[in-house]
Amino acid sequence: MLLLWLRNALPSMYNRQLARGALLIALALALQGLRLVVPLPLPVSTFLIGTLVHMMLTLTLQLNGRSTALLLGALLPVTAYLQGQLAVPLLLPVVWLGNTVFVLALATLLNKKWLYLLLPPLVKAVLMLAGAWLVLELLALEQLNVRRMLLFAMSVPQLVTGIAGIALAKALLRRLRNV
């Protein structure tokens, strides 16, 4: 009811936010798809795309709000799976939950001096590591190398790219505000 009233009362503002949200989501999905177009070694691709994705989650949160950022956080693992970057389908909810916690922690800590830079990526990395471990236990995956690779991918890169993505978004927002 309130949403309808707002939509009728403030149509240009509502439309502007809807359009901006759609553009931010489209840009994030396009950046995530770079790995399909630009052939990069896996480690470079992981850290570059991961940083850009975390930057877009942060920018979307700050420019369009929590709802749009949470929607983006849900779409990203689905597109990663469709692109072949998420090998185990049971990891989809793990990545979605990690993105959700990242966005919510970032929204909560945005005005805290250094906590916003470190805590959301750390919480996401720990949560995704625990979630991936649970999934691998459920699957009873025996191959030690595959287990190690998946557990690493769900932890350390999330922490590093999360911090880098937040820092990049902050620098970009500073530049945008000066324009």
Residue spans for each PLM region:
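Loop-helix junctions at membrane interfaces
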Residues: 1-179
